[in-house]
């Protein structure tokens, strides 16, 4: 099997992007793991696959695979790279691109300054739709994680997120608490774990331990989830800058029942071809 690919990143959250419309490529879980290896493969946090639309009302279908080969529902940084890729490769000349995902639909708007705004949909706080095991919906949940008791928010941005507020994100126990939260029994489909430091009502600092990938330089849906939880808990205003290790994202959300918008860059690194 021979195919072409692009290496891209959104604030350091890096991707291998493959056009599966003009190429016939099949990715097994084993192959994805081999390609994701940073020593012996291409190296990436996620594989993004561009497919022909499943829904006639959309332009493309967008699939996301983590480095461990598991398929996931959403990736915000990947969505921005997806938008740049399909235009760069001549698959569309639209500036507003509609895509379907495993969990729903998204609109990707390419701005004149090469920033890309993604309509991430309406944040979902109902526990059974995240999914999260809880008796009822709350703004804050008490969770026992290892030897610690954490106060967390839970939300779905198309994929599940748990968010805990910390005093200093640099000293947050991401390496130890991240894996424990990711596989916590209250999240039956595992979860992305965000550690949020509130700088002021318009800025947060954030680190994210991603389900199936570990800590990444940036997580778009994690930034969205953190802001949604922060606004719900009364900590943040509707326009927030999220400072991640890889750079800044801008999030706008007017509150429950409204769609959330994420704006940020998408960077093309190189093109390549592989025979597997």
Curated annotation (Swiss-Prot):
Gene3D superfamilies noted in UniProt: Diaminopimelate Epimerase, Chain A, domain 1
TM annotation in the entry: none
Catalytic-site annotation from UniProt: 75 (proton donor), 219 (proton acceptor)
Chain residues that bind substrate: 13, 46, 66, 76-77, 159, 192, 210-211, 220-221
Keywords: Amino-acid biosynthesis, Cytoplasm, Isomerase, Lysine biosynthesis
Gene Ontology CC entries for this record: cytosol
Site (Important for dimerization): 270
GO molecular function terms listed in the Swiss-Prot or TrEMBL record: diaminopimelate epimerase activity
Record family assignment: Belongs to the diaminopimelate epimerase family.
Subunit structure: Homodimer.
Function field: Catalyzes the stereoinversion of LL-2,6-diaminopimelate (L,L-DAP) to meso-diaminopimelate (meso-DAP), a precursor of L-lysine and an essential component of the bacterial peptidoglycan.
Protein known as: Diaminopimelate epimerase
Organism field: Vibrio vulnificus (strain YJ016)
